[in-house]
UniProtKB/Swiss-Prot annotation:
Cofactor section: [4Fe-4S] cluster
Domain TRAM: 383-448
PANTHER family listed in its UniProt record: RIBOSOMAL PROTEIN S12 METHYLTHIOTRANSFERASE RIMO, RIBOSOMAL PROTEIN US12 METHYLTHIOTRANSFERASE RIMO
Catalytic activity: L-aspartate(89)-[ribosomal protein uS12]-hydrogen + (sulfur carrier)-SH + AH2 + 2 S-adenosyl-L-methionine = 3-methylsulfanyl-L-aspartate(89)-[ribosomal protein uS12]-hydrogen + (sulfur carrier)-H + 5'-deoxyadenosine + L-methionine + A + S-adenosyl-L-homocysteine + 2 H(+)
Protein's name according to its UniProt entry: Ribosomal protein uS12 methylthiotransferase RimO
Compartment(s): Cytoplasm
Pfam families, per the entry: Radical_SAM (PF04055), TRAM_2 (PF18693), UPF0004 (PF00919)
Keywords, alphabetical: 4Fe-4S, Cytoplasm, Iron, Iron-sulfur, Metal-binding, S-adenosyl-L-methionine, Transferase
EC number: 2.8.4.4
Gene assigned in the entry: rimO
One example of a Gene Ontology biological process annotation: tRNA modification
């Protein structure tokens, strides 16, 4: 009997590799994840280094002039290290600036232009599709650790703050239908995510543009409304943390959900200032007394509520009296977590035309005074947690023990909870621990 040689196995060409540099806010990080998920589904591999990539994507930030400089520097580094670079993100709105600075760039697209980014990658490195190899998890690819994820619920913003150019970059508010948000959230939780960080430009305005329209999720109607969305997310069994909330009156409605433990008692509200005169110049809500009343009401309804906020010092026209007003307001408001920025002009912002520029040395001095003032407030509020048993989400474990976060700590921007000697834990574990020491930012606890 004669033997027949088996046909040679078909050899597939190596999958093209894409590298990415993601700059800016968590919302931009979500954009990067969506782009990578799409590319991975088409057979591309993700490279963790410049030299291993066939093309590099740089997702830029263009919010501040300093962020533009950082983005241009990152583009330059990618060109130097790899040479094949596609630019996307907020700075992509200024394609002329990018091409003037870096003419070697292969393509430039604007923010949340996913189709254009993917098409640009196709032009540079055509995809190699194989249905057996190009498997993507249903929750998509993420750039965060496995146990937490950012959930973007809308794009753009309807506010017109004079220091901000986001509406000119990302447009007016465009909310995602509630069923799409909930479907994504369910996939994330099913994949092991323990914490959902809800982000947008204005989270509390969610659904306004849709007129709170209903959509169907699991054969029942769900409304595109801030409270309804929080209620739905609170039933998924994961931590739900609310970021970028505007101090609208209807925020009061979510406080009971926090008191019931369905949503984390944590609000990230960028107040920006307290002086009515400065807030008016910023085109921000200027009723400082009503906001203080609202804060007191929130804490009465949910004593564990943690408030994070950001402020700007040195805004054009800010006087010493305005700044002292802000310090006094902080003493009364008792903000738990605070970030502060020295004002800097942003190309295209209306604030550039406001008279009374504050000298850089005065901005610096006020920044230090505010941070020192706030440190004492934060320290006292942290000390009040000593002796309390809290739930801790573990972020990292090494030979010294575990590092995690409580309800009061958002990743990257807030403090940590240290559990010394707890080396048997793993990332994503939720454990109970009693706080025995604190400083202005962090806590030390022993496992219960």
């Amino acid at each position: 009997m004669s033997e027949t040689a088996a046909p040679a196995a078909k050899t597939l060409a190596p999958a093209p590799k894409v590298g990415i540099v993601s700059l800016g806010c968590p919302k931009a990080l979500v954009d990067s994840e969506r782009i990578l998920t799409k590319l991975r589904s088409e057979g591309y591999e993700i490279s963790g280094s410049y030299d291993g990539a066939d093309v590099v994507l740089v997702n830029t930030c263009g919010f501040l002039d300093s962020a533009k400089t950082e983005s241009l520097d990152a583009i330059g580094e990618a060109i130097k290290e790899n040479g094949r670079v596609i630019v996307t993100g907020c700075l992509g709105k200024d394609a002329e600036l990018i091409r003037e600075t870096h003419p070697q760039v292969l393509a430039v697209t604007g923010p949340h232009q996913y189709e254009q980014v993917v098409a640009a990658v196709h032009d540079v490195v055509p995809p190699r599709h194989d249905p057996y190899l190009d498997l993507v998890p249903p929750q998509g690819l993420r750039l965060t650790p496995r146990h937490y994820a950012y959930l973007k619920i809308s794009e753009g913003c309807n506010n017109r703050c004079t220091f901000c150019i986001i509406p000119s970059i990302r447009g007016d508010l465009v909310s995602r239908p509630a069923n799409l948000v909930l479907a994504e959230a369910e996939k994330l939780v099913k994949a092991g995510v323990k914490e959902l960080l809800v982000v947008s430009q204005d989270t509390s305005a969610y659904g306004v543009d849709l007129k709170y329209a209903e959509s169907r999720h699991r054969n029942r109607p769900v409304r595109a409304r801030f409270l309804d969305l929080c209620q739905e997310l609170g039933q998924l069994g994961a931590w739900v943390r609310l970021h970028y909330v505007y101090p609208y009156p209807h925020v009061d409605e979510v406080i009971p959900l926090m008191a019931e433990g369905k949503v984390l008692p944590y609000l990230d509200i960028p107040f920006q200032h307290a002086s009515p005169r400065v807030l008016k110049a910023m085109r921000r809500p200027a009723d400082h007394e009503r906001i203080l009343e609202r804060i007191k009401g929130w804490r009465a309804g949910c004593p564990d509520l943690t408030l994070r906020s950001t402020f700007i010092v040195g805004f054009p026209g800010e006087t010493e009296e305005d700044f002292q007003f802000l310090l006094d307001w902080l003493t009364e408001a008792q903000i738990d977590r605070l970030g502060c920025f020295q004002y800097e002009p942003v190309t295209g912002a209306k604030a550039n035309g406001i008279p009374g520029a504050v000298p850089d040395e005065v901005k610096e001095e006020r920044w230090h005074r505010l941070m020192q003032h706030q440190q004492a407030i934060s320290d006292a509020r942290m000390q009040a947690r000593i002796g309390r048993s809290i739930e801790v989400l573990i972020d990292e474990v090494d030979e010294d023990g575990a590092t995690g976060r409580s309800w009061a700590d958002a990743p990257e921007i807030d403090g940590n909870v240290f559990l010394n000697g707890e080396t048997d834990l793993k990332q994503g574990d939720l454990v109970k621990a009693t706080v025995f020491a604190t400083d202005a930012y962090d806590a030390w606890a022993e496992r219960d």
